[in-house]
C-alpha cells in the first residue's frame, strides 16, 4: 500500500531523527534521503552536511517549498557520503542523480527531446547520424547539439553526405561487394575496406569542423587543397573540392546570427520568469555562429532565478554525454558557489571553463538577445497554457464535472478482421500529450480471433488490465476520492500521478457500456469519470444517458476530446501495423522445414526483412548465429528451388 503510517516518517520518530542528526558531520558531501521501502526520494549536496540536513527538520522552518515539504514527510532514513571538497560533492551529486533519478530531484524538463548529431569515433570507420539518445561519457564518440530544428539538421546532414563521401550504413549490405552508394560516389567503400581508416578520418574531420562552427577554417583548408589539385592538373578532383566549398557556403548563407569575436566558443543562458512559469534559453555559439539552441520550461515555480540557473547548469552539463563544454558560459546574473561550478565544469571539460556575467557591450548584448528569446518563449508557453485551460474548463462544463480534468486518458482498439488486436492508452496532462505515460496492449482474450472481432470485449480487457491494481488498492482500504487533491503527503507521488481525472473511449454507446461494465466489475464505476466520442458527427456520450450531449462543432472542450481521440487512434493503428508486419514476416518463414520461432527471430534480426533473406547466398545465411550449414541449405533452396547452370 502506498500509504505512510505514523512509524514510517522521521518527523514522527524523533528518537531516530535525533540519532541520525548526531552522526552527520559538518563536512562537505552528499546526502541521500529514503522512504520506508528504501526508495530514494532525494539527493542533495552541501559544504556542511549537518547544517543542511538539520534545516529540513526545523520545526519552525516555513521556507520549505510545498514540493520539498511533501518529500520531508516521507523521509525514513538518511545516508551521507563525505567528499574532500565542495566541487567534488557537486560532481558526485550530479552522477548520483543521473544514475538514480530520484522523484524529488526533477526540476526542469526540456520542452522537447531535442536531437543530437553523433560521430562514432570509437569505430574504425566512424558513422555520422542523428540521434536522441546518448552513450556513456567514457565513450570516444562525439555529440553536437542539441538542435531545435530537426528538419534543418536532416537537410544539413543530407547535403554533407552528398558533398563528402561518408559511410552510409550501420552495417554492410553485402559481404563480398559494395552497394549502390559506392557506385554513385556517396560512400568510399568502407564495407570492403577500399579506403584506409586514416584517410577516411581526414574526410570526417572536415565534416566535424562544420558542426564545431569552424566553417571559415574549413573553407580555407579546402581552397588550398583545390589549388594544389589544380597545379597537379587533377581538375576532376579540384572540381569536387570546389563544389564542396560552394555547398558549405550555401549551407550557412541563412546563418544571420554572428558575433565579432569569431574565435571564441561559448554557451549563453537567458531566463524569463513570472509567478508560476520559468523559461530558460541556452544558445550554443561556436566560432561566432549559432549552432544549437535548447529551451527549458519549468512550472510550479519554487526557486529564485539564480538558483534556477544553477540547477540548469547542474542538470544540463551532467546529463549531456560527450558534448563539448565550451570554455566560456555567459549568464545574466551570478549564481551561488560560482567558483565551485567553474571548477566542476573545468574537470568535465578537461580544461578551464569560466562563468561570466558580462559587462562589455558585445557580450552583454548577446545575453540580452538570449533573454529576449526566453521572454518570447515564456509568452508562447503562457498563451498555450491559456488555450489549454480554456479547453479544459469548457470540457468540465460540457461533462458537468466537479473539477477540471488535469489528466485525461484516451483508449482505442485496432485490428484487421480480428487479427493482431491491440489497444492503446494515450495521456493528456493539462491538455498536452504526455507520451511518457502512453501504453500499448496486445489483446490476450482467446475469444477474439481471425474473423471473430469484438471491440467491446477488447476494450473491457484493456480497462481491466489498466485499473486492476487500483481495484486492489480500494479493496485494501484506500479512499480513491482523496486522489483528487494530488498533494497528499500520505501517498507516493508516483502513484498519485497515475490516477486519471477522466477517461475517454473512442466509440459510441456500445463501447461506453462495455467500459462501464468493466469498471463495475473492478468496483471503480463510481470513482472514475468516463465519456465516449463517436466518430459519426463527433457525438459525446456519458454513462446514465442514452442521448448525446449538446455541443457545438468547434466548442473548445470538444476540440480537445477530438485531439485525444485522434491521438489514441494513431497510436493504436501504428502498433497494429507493426505487429501485423512482424506476423507477416514470420508467416513467410514458418513453413520452412527445421525453422522454428527462435531461428526466425535470428534470421530477421540479422537480415531485417524476408526480401533480404531471399536475396542472400547460402554462405550468408549460414553465418547467422544458431544456423548450421544444413539448415542454411534448406532455407536457400526454399527460396531458390531451381538453379540453372550458365554455360
From Swiss-Prot:
Protein name as annotated: UvrABC system protein C
Domain UVR: 216-251
Location of the protein in the cell: Cytoplasm
Top-level taxon of origin: Bacteria
Positions of the GIY-YIG domain: 26-106
Gene name of the record: uvrC
Main location: cytoplasm
UniProt-listed InterPro entries: GIY-YIG_endonuc, GIY-YIG_endonuc_sf, GIY-YIG_UvrC_Cho, Hlx-hairpin-Hlx_DNA-bd_motif, RuvA_2-like, UVR_dom, UVR_dom_sf, UvrABC_protein_C
Subunit relationships: Interacts with UvrB in an incision complex.
SUPFAM superfamilies: C-terminal UvrC-binding domain of UvrB (SSF46600), GIY-YIG endonuclease (SSF82771), RuvA domain 2-like (SSF47781)
Organism of origin: Prochlorococcus marinus (strain MIT 9211)
Gene Ontology annotations of biological process type: nucleotide-excision repair; SOS response
GO molecular function: DNA binding; excinuclease ABC activity
Pfam families: GIY-YIG, HHH_5, UVR, UvrC_RNaseH, UvrC_RNaseH_dom
Chain's role: The UvrABC repair system catalyzes the recognition and processing of DNA lesions. UvrC both incises the 5' and 3' sides of the lesion. The N-terminal half is responsible for the 3' incision and the C-terminal half is responsible for the 5' incision.
Amino acid at each position: 500500500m502506498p500509504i505512510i503510517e505514523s512509524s514510517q516518517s522521521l518527523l514522527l520518530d524523533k528518537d531516530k531523527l535525533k540519532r541520525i542528526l548526531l552522526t552527520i558531520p559538518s563536512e562537505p558531501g552528499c546526502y541521500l534521503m529514503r522512504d520506508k521501502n528504501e526508495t530514494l526520494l532525494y539527493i542533495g549536496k552541501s559544504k556542511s552536511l549537518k547544517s543542511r540536513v538539520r534545516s529540513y527538520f526545523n520545526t519552525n522552518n516555513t521556507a520549505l517549498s510545498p514540493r520539498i515539504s511533501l518529500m520531508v514527510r516521507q523521509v525514513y532514513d538518511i545516508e551521507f557520503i563525505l567528499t574532500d571538497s565542495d566541487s567534488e560533492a557537486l560532481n558526485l551529486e550530479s552522477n548520483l542523480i543521473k544514475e538514480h533519478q530520484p522523484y524529488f530531484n526533477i526540476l526542469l524538463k526540456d520542452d522537447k527531446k531535442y536531437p543530437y548529431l553523433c560521430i562514432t569515433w570509437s569505430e574504425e570507420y566512424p558513422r555520422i547520424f542523428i540521434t536522441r539518445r546518448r552513450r556513456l561519457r567514457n565513450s570516444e564518440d562525439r555529440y553536437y547539439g542539441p538542435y531545435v530544428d530537426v528538419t534543418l539538421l536532416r537537410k544539413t546532414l543530407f547535403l554533407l553526405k552528398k558533398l563528402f563521401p561518408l559511410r552510409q550504413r550501420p552495417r554492410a549490405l553485402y559481404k563480398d561487394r559494395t552497394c549502390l552508394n559506392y557506385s554513385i560516389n556517396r560512400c568510399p567503400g568502407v564495407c570492403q575496406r577500399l579506403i584506409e581508416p586514416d584517410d577516411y578520418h581526414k574526410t570526417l574531420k572536415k565534416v566535424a569542423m562544420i558542426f564545431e562552427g569552424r566553417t571559415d577554417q574549413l573553407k580555407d583548408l579546402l581552397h588550398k587543397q583545390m589549388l594544389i589539385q589544380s597545379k597537379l592538373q587533377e581538375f576532376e578532383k579540384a572540381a569536387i573540392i570546389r563544389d564542396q566549398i560552394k555547398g558549405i557556403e550555401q549551407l550557412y548563407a541563412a546563418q544571420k546570427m554572428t558575433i565579432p569575436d569569431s574565435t571564441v566558443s561559448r554557451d549563453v543562458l537567458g531566463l524569463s520568469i513570472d509567478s508560476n512559469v520559468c523559461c530558460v534559453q541556452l544558445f550554443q555559439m561556436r566560432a561566432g555562429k549559432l549552432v544549437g539552441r535548447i529551451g527549458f520550461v519549468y512550472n510550479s515555480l519554487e526557486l529564485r532565478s539564480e538558483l534556477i540557473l544553477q540547477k540548469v547548469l547542474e542538470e544540463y552539463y551532467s546529463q549531456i554525454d560527450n558534448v563539448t563544454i565550451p570554455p566560456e558560459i555567459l549568464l545574466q546574473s551570478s549564481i551561488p558557489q560560482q567558483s565551485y561550478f567553474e571548477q566542476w565544469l573545468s574537470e568535465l571539460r578537461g580544461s578551464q571553463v569560466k562563468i561570466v556575467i558580462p559587462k562589455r557591450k558585445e557580450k552583454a548584448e548577446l545575453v540580452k538577445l538570449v533573454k529576449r528569446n526566453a521572454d518570447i518563449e515564456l509568452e508562447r508557453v503562457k498563451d498555450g497554457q491559456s488555450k489549454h485551460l480554456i479547453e479544459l474548463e469548457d470540457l468540465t462544463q460540457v461533462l458537468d464535472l466537479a473539477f477540471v480534468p488535469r489528466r485525461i486518458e484516451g483508449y482505442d482498439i485496432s485490428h484487421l478482421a480480428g487479427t493482431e488486436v491491440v489497444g492503446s492508452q494515450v495521456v493528456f496532462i493539462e491538455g498536452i500529450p504526455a507520451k511518457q505515460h502512453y501504453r500499448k496492449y496486445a489483446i490476450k482474450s482467446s475469444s477474439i480471433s481471425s474473423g471473430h472481432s469484438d471491440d467491446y470485449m477488447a476494450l473491457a480487457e484493456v480497462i481491466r488490465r489498466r485499473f486492476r491494481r487500483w481495484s486492489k488498492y480500494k479493496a485494501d482500504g484506500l479512499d480513491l476520492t482523496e486522489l483528487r487533491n494530488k498533494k497528499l503527503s500520505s501517498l507516493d507521488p508516483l502513484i498519485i500521478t497515475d490516477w486519471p481525472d477522466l477517461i475517454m473511449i473512442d466509440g459510441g454507446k456500445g463501447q461506453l457500456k462495455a467500459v462501464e461494465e468493466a469498471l463495475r466489475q473492478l468496483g471503480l464505476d463510481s470513482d472514475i469519470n468516463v465519456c465516449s466520442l463517436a466518430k459519426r458527427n463527433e457525438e459525446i456520450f456519458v454513462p446514465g444517458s442514452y442521448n448525446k450531449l449538446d455541443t457545438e462543432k468547434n466548442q473548445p472542450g470538444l476540440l480537445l476530446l477530438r485531439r485525444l481521440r485522434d491521438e489514441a487512434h494513431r497510436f493504436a493503428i501504428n502498433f497494429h501495423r507493426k505487429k501485423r508486419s512482424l506476423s507477416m514476416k514470420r508467416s513467410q518463414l514458418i513453413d520452412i522445414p527445421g525453422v522454428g520461432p527462435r531461428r526466425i527471430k535470428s534470421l530477421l534480426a540479422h537480415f531485417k526483412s524476408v526480401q533480404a533473406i531471399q536475396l542472400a547466398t547460402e554462405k550468408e545465411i549460414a553465418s547467422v548465429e544458431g544456423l548450421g550449414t544444413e539448415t542454411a541449405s534448406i532455407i536457400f533452396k526454399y527460396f531458390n528451388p531451381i538453379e540453372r547452370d550458365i554455360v
